[in-house]
Amino acid sequence: MKHVLISFLLFTTVIFPTRIFSHHYSIIAHTISDSAREARSVSAADVDGDGDMDVLAGHNNISWYENDGSESFTTHTISTSAASSVYAVDLDGDGDMDVVGSSAGSVGWYENDGSGNFATHTICNHYWHRGFRSVYALDVDRDGYMDVVAASSSPNNKIMWYENDGSQYFNH
């Protein structure tokens, strides 16, 4: 019985390989920006609250690519500071998407006022924390406020979390 099953499986994979192992997917690349110099990170969120997904990018600055809903994007600069990682999250609980970003020596967040304007806030800016590479937000301590998690590479090799106290300040 085992030989019959193996023979059947070999026969079907040789005779009908496209039906069993092949799926016909079509992926088409669309350019959002051709000027995102040294882009390192992207995140998607409805930044402007209009119902379509926008794109954030971390590179020599932090950019927001506003989706107009018809596959066209308008570029906005959130910060002129370089960023190795960006993440969209409502940090202040006001219903709009803020942006968290990390760079070589700092982690910051950019408060969205709901009209496309962003105020800069520093979470961590320590000279000894060189090499922040990744940033994320979640409610680590389950107090209802989104906290920030950041990972750094050499020489620190640390993963840190910063507690959001609910008043737009972060404790180390």
Where are these regions (language model features)?
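Positively charged n-region of N-terminal signal peptides that target proteins for export
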Residues: 1-4
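Blade-edge motifs of beta-propeller repeat domains
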Residues: 21-37, 66-81, 111-130, 163-172
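Beta-propeller blade termini
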Residues: 40-47, 84-91, 133-140
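Intrinsically disordered, low-complexity segments used as extracellular stalks/linkers
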Residues: 53, 64-66, 84, 97, ...
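Hydrophobic beta-strand segments that make up the repeating blades of beta-propeller
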Residues: 55-58, 97-103, 148-152
